[in-house]
């Protein structure tokens, strides 16, 4: 499977993941970004045809080429071509009565926009407020994730920052919090922004044993205790939460956005 783009290829790759995930089959992926001239397209065709001759089956090619000459050249490849622009842009041009700009990399040319700056600020905020490192400026947070250690708070926080420009802090619930039976006092003022993550104890012990094998921290009995205490605390405090055990980061983030009613998209 080839991903051919005149830009970074992020759009085509994301689309290909969504489509191919519907098939229980593994694909060998070849990325070919910045194919923005007919000459580069000819080189791409050569590599695609080589794969065809070596493997005996036409490769699948996901493409987002704006340059019409490059597009024509690519279509000489012995492959199944899935052209996102032709599939979606041409019908839209007809429906809207407008011609598209056909600008290369238009979707990602946002380095000077306010949205891009917001995303960078959000990433910096999430890094500074990872794992309870700082309680400073929590009023700026769009969401504050809580949960036991290794329940998925950090990757979810960073995904929310990078994908949606959300300032996401996260705080680990620890034995001291369980003994008190309540959230840390620093978080109470921001309770409407808090969302909890939990995880199956068996899965948690597997993850923790990769980090600290044989420790009390990773023991199944301790993981059960922490998860039970954290879930009980979130129920008492009226905090919405979900189990991250069988959910992707994308699914977790989407649920959080729905539950805390954040309407912001800086992607």
UniProtKB/Swiss-Prot annotation:
GO terms for molecular function: ADP binding; ATP binding; phosphotransferase activity, phosphate group as acceptor; protein serine/threonine kinase activity. The keyword Kinase applies. It is an enzyme of class 2 (transferase). Pfam families: Kinase-PPPase. This is Putative phosphoenolpyruvate synthase regulatory protein. It comes from Cupriavidus necator (strain ATCC 17699 / DSM 428 / KCTC 22496 / NCIMB 10442 / H16 / Stanier 337) (Ralstonia eutropha). PANTHER family: PYRUVATE, PHOSPHATE DIKINASE REGULATORY PROTEIN 1, CHLOROPLASTIC. The keyword Membrane does not apply. Its EC number is 2.7.11.33, 2.7.4.28. ADP binds at residues 147-154. Keywords: Kinase, Nucleotide-binding, Serine/threonine-protein kinase, Transferase. Bifunctional serine/threonine kinase and phosphorylase involved in the regulation of the phosphoenolpyruvate synthase (PEPS) by catalyzing its phosphorylation/dephosphorylation. It catalyses: [pyruvate, water dikinase] + ADP = [pyruvate, water dikinase]-phosphate + AMP + H(+); [pyruvate, water dikinase]-phosphate + phosphate + H(+) = [pyruvate, water dikinase] + diphosphate. It comes from the Bacteria. Belongs to the pyruvate, phosphate/water dikinase regulatory protein family. PSRP subfamily. InterPro entries: Kinase-pyrophosphorylase (IPR005177), PSRP (IPR026530).
């Amino acid at each position: 499977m080839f991903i051919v783009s005149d830009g970074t290829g992020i759009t085509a790759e994301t689309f290909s993941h969504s489509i191919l995930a519907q098939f229980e089959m593994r694909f060998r992926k070849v990325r070919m970004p910045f194919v923005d001239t007919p000459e580069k397209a000819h080189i791409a065709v050569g590599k695609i045809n080589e794969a065809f001759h070596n493997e005996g089956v036409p490769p699948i090619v996901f493409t987002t080429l704006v340059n019409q000459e490059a597009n024509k050249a690519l279509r000489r490849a012995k492959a199944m071509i899935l052209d996102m622009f032709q599939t979606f842009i041409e019908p839209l041009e007809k429906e809207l009565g407008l011609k598209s700009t056909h600008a290369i990399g238009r979707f990602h040319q946002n380095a000077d926009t306010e949205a891009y700056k917001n995303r960078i600020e959000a990433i910096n905020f999430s890094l500074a407020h990872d794992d309870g490192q700082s309680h400073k400026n929590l009023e700026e947070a769009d969401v504050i994730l809580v949960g036991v250690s290794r329940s998925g708070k950090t990757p979810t926080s960073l995904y929310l920052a990078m994908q949606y420009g959300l300032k996401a802090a996260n705080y680990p619930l620890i034995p001291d919090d369980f003994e008190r039976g309540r959230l840390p006092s620093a978080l109470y003022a921001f309770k409407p922004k808090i969302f909890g993550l939990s995880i199956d104890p068996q899965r948690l012990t597997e993850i923790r044993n990769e980090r600290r094998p044989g420790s009390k921290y990773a023991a199944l009995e301790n993981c059960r205790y922490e998860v039970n205490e954290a879930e009980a605390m979130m129920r008492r405090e009226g905090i919405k939460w979900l189990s991250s055990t069988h959910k992707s980061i994308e699914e977790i983030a989407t649920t959080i956005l729905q539950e805390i009613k954040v309407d912001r998209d800086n992607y």
